[in-house]
Amino acid sequence: IENTAASLEGRGPHGLFHKMQEVRAENPDLIYYYQSDYKGYYDHILHDKMIDIIKQYIADPILLPILIDFVKVLHPDGNEGISKGLRSSQFFGNLYHNDIDHAMIEECGKDNYNRFCDDIYILGDNKKELWKHRDTLHRLSKPYNLIIKPSEKVAPVSAGMDALGYIDYGDHSRIRKRTKVNAARKLAKIKSRKRRQ
């Protein structure tokens, strides 16, 4: 899916952010957005459902048990939650949400629906339609044991859409303050290490 960007080669937060800007530039009526985030996304992934999804794509008798072990590595006796640290978990997270993505694209249009990991952004030309999309997302997420945080919102882009490390105001955007602070800290650590060498 073109508008999902997490853990996919050549697709990161900056690319997705700029793609959303391009879509809005081509469609100036898209002045509102819906934004949501799942609560503990990886912690709520159901093992049985994840394994069923994997089996739809992989039947290899050697590879399949290995992938099932990756799903269960964090909670071998439980039925919920996958490790956040493994590269395979990022892949599983994308795969787990794939059917929801397709259904939402069908409803919202491929250019209006965007997802990065567990953050979802839907662009629209009116609030009522975005609230309808919100209800659909809640309904689709429920069977997957995914819970949307209460901080979700529908708002005008001009008020500042906080997305993917940027704040977009429609006519201009800027880097989020905490993104700049974190980058400055990392740079200071690198400089400090170089001085000690």
What are these regions (language model features)?
Residues 2-5:
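A short alpha-helix capping/helix-loop junction motif
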Residues 11, 16-117, 122-136, 151, ...:
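Conserved polymerase palm-domain catalytic core
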Residues 58, 138-146:
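A common structural junction motif
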Residues 70-73, 78, 131-132, 138, ...:
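Right-hand nucleic-acid polymerase module
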